[in-house]
Structures are given as structure tokens and as C-alpha cells.
């Protein structure tokens, strides 16, 4: 008996796959490599996708019409996922979970009264949550936002700068995964940058400090800072020419001063080591960004005797800097007033991040104006 041919079925399957791929390509009208998509934060272009690495990294652009679709995918390890936040026409649009491993459209609905709309996309989670990929957009038309000579700020910090534990609208504290309440859009750093109309980059790692982590000796932020992916796994180095900050604002020390988790042995805070390694980190930053001024921040989470100790350490770093670099303007120091954090795991919530941003804004306006005079 003659065997039935499998060729028609094979051709049908191939045709179906091709049609599916073609449809996907037709739906995504504008790929991530397009110049209209202005890259923000710590990102790298990988094949046809833009990899969003650090907290608040993303893209911004303008689109015509009353809707667009943003194609994203999640490249976190195992069953982890990411979150993305959107800002549409200067207003917060919302946060969405990205747990799909292949490109998927996320719909954005705009007001039909305007021809053009500005969309900003922010990675709400952080580098250690894994990669978030931006593949492109479906829309009637897209174009770049208008370029302005913006102030450029880089914030180097820990979980507070990441926006950990500040957004409980979908997942209450003590529920879900440790990063389910992350929202870098509502970090004090992002808030104050928007208030100052500044372009900004967050180099922040939850749990890490100047010379140790909150409950262990590693990692430290300086040990990971020069990695393109803010981790110890990648050999790829960061491109320091892609973002040239006017000011580098450092908010590190909370985790160094931490008492730990009560399980692992914890040595007493070593102020001499903290001062020395903080200054060494400043030297690294000078070698990478010689044009930048520095601002050193205390923490509203550190109180009483520890706050006094922390502040005195920053003054010591400032004095050492002035001694070694007499030709450079000394780092400025901002002392945060104490805040009783009501977010998750002892972190500030969105309102408390707003308080921090207001405090920091007044300081930054003052020192920036002084630097310009």
C-alpha cells in the first residue's frame, strides 16, 4: 500500500510558521534599533532588542494616533520576572508585569484629541532581577522627542534608590516575591530628576554598600559598578561615554551600617575602611567621569548615633578629597532628615520617596546654582 505523503502537511506547517512570523513583523512596525527611540539609563543593544539593565532604564519617543503597542519580553532567570512602568504625556500611566519569554505587545491607550503623544518606558525592577528586552513598537507613526540641553544626573545607591518596597497597589507587603513592590519610577532619584527636568541614570543595587552588603561581606557597589550588567557574571564593561553626568549623587552607607540578619556573623562597622573605600570609589569615578561633580548623601533610614557616625564619615571623605584633589571642587554633602519608613521591609513608600525628593531638590538646586556662578 502506498504511504501517504507528509510533504503537503510539512509545507502547510512551514507556511503557517512563515505567516505567523510575517504577521508579527507587520504588527511591530518600528524595531528597537530605530533612532526615534531615545535610550535612557544603563542599556545595551543586543541583536534586534534593546536590553534594559538598571532601575529606571528605558526608552522614550513620540507616537501619532490614539494608541500604540510596546513589544517587551522578560529574560530573568528561572521563574523570575520584571516590571515596567509607563509615563504618557507627562503623567504616570501605570506599572505592568512582564513575565513572557517571547516578545509580546503591551497596549497603551492615549487621548485622541492630540495628534502626537510622548511615551516614556521605565524598567521598574533592578539589574539583579534580570533583563527586560524592548523589541519595538506598533503605531501609526513614531518620532524622537525634542532634544534639549538637559542637566544630567547619575545616582549610585542601594535598594532605596532602586525603589524597593515602595509600590503596594497590586501586591501588599510580605506577599509575592521580594521585588513585587519595586517601582523605580517612584524612587526619590527619579522623582527629583523629573522635578529638575534632568536626564538621569540609576546605578543602584539592593542590599549592597561601599565595602559590604547588608548581611554579608559581598557584594559591594564599587565591585560591580563597572560591569555593563551591574553583576559579577558578565565580563562586558560599561560604556562610560554613553552617559556623561554633570553630577554623580552617591547614596551608600545604609547597608554598611546594617546590623545584619541576626543569623550570619557580623563584624562591627569599620569607619576607617568605609572612609578609605569610599574615597577609592570616588577616584574610580573621577577616572571614568572627570567632568562630574559629586554629592554625597546620608540616609533617612539611619538614625541617632549611627546617623552622626555616618555624617562624620562623609565629612572625612570630603576632607580627604579636598586634600588629594585641591584643584577640584570638593564633594557636597546632603544630610537627610530622618523618615519613619512605612513601605515594605523597612523601605520608604511612594509618599516618603516624595519627601526625600523634596529635601534633595532644594539641596541640588542650591549647589548647582553655586557651581554655575
Description of each model-found segment:
Residues 152-156, 161, 200-204, 246-251, ...:
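Structural recognition of the beta-strand scaffold that forms the well-ordered cores
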Residues 2-5, 19-156, 160-181, 373:
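N-terminal secretory targeting modules
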Residues 251-256, 281-313:
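Active-site segments of SGNH/GDSL-like serine hydrolases
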Amino acid at each position: 500500500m502506498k504511504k501517504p505523503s507528509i510533504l503537503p502537511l510539512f509545507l502547510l506547517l512551514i507556511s503557517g510558521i512563515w505567516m505567523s512570523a510575517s504577521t508579527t513583523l507587520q504588527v511591530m512596525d518600528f524595531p528597537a534599533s530605530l533612532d526615534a527611540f531615545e535610550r535612557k539609563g544603563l542599556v545595551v543593544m543586543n541583536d534586534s532588542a534593546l536590553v534594559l539593565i538598571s532601575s529606571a532604564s528605558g526608552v522614550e519617543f513620540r507616537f501619532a494616533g490614539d494608541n500604540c503597542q510596546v513589544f517587551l519580553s522578560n529574560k530573568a532567570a528561572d521563574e523570575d520576572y520584571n516590571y515596567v512602568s509607563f509615563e504618557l504625556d507627562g503623567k504616570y500611566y501605570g506599572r505592568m508585569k512582564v513575565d513572557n519569554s517571547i516578545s509580546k505587545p503591551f497596549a497603551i491607550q492615549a487621548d485622541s484629541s492630540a495628534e502626537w503623544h510622548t511615551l516614556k518606558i521605565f524598567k521598574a525592577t533592578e539589574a539583579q532581577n534580570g533583563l527586560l528586552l524592548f523589541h519595538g513598537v506598533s503605531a501609526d507613526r513614531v518620532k524622537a522627542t525634542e532634544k534639549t540641553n538637559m542637566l544630567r544626573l547619575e545616582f549610585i545607591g542601594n535598594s532605596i534608590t532602586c525603589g524597593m518596597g515602595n509600590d503596594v497597589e497590586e501586591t501588599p507587603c510580605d506577599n509575592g516575591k521580594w521585588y513585587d513592590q519595586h517601582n523605580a519610577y517612584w524612587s526619590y532619584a527619579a522623582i527629583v530628576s523629573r522635578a529638575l527636568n534632568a536626564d538621569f541614570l540609576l546605578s543602584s543595587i539592593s542590599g549592597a554598600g561601599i565595602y559590604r552588603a547588608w548581611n554579608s561581606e559581598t557584594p559591594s557597589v564599587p565591585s560591580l559598578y563597572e560591569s555593563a550588567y551591574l553583576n559579577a557574571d558578565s565580563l562586558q564593561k560599561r560604556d562610560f561615554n554613553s552617559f556623561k553626568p554633570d553630577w554623580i549623587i552617591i547614596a551608600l552607607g545604609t547597608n554598611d551600617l546594617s546590623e545584619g540578619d541576626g543569623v550570619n556573623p557580623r563584624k562591627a562597622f569599620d569607619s576607617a575602611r568605609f572612609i578609605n573605600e569610599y574615597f577609592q570609589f570616588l577616584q574610580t569615578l573621577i577616572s571614568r567621569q572627570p567632568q562630574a561633580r559629586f554629592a554625597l548623601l546620608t540616609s533617612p533610614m539611619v538614625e541617632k548615633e549611627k546617623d552622626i557616625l555616618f555624617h562624620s564619615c562623609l565629612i572625612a571623605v570630603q576632607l580627604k578629597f579636598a586634600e588629594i584633589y585641591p584643584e577640584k571642587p570638593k564633594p557636597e554633602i546632603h544630610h537627610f532628615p530622618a523618615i519613619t519608613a512605612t513601605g515594605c521591609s523597612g523601605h520608604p513608600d511612594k509618599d516618603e520617596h516624595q519627601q526625600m525628593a523634596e529635601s534633595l531638590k532644594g539641596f541640588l538646586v542650591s549647589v548647582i546654582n553655586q557651581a554655575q556662578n
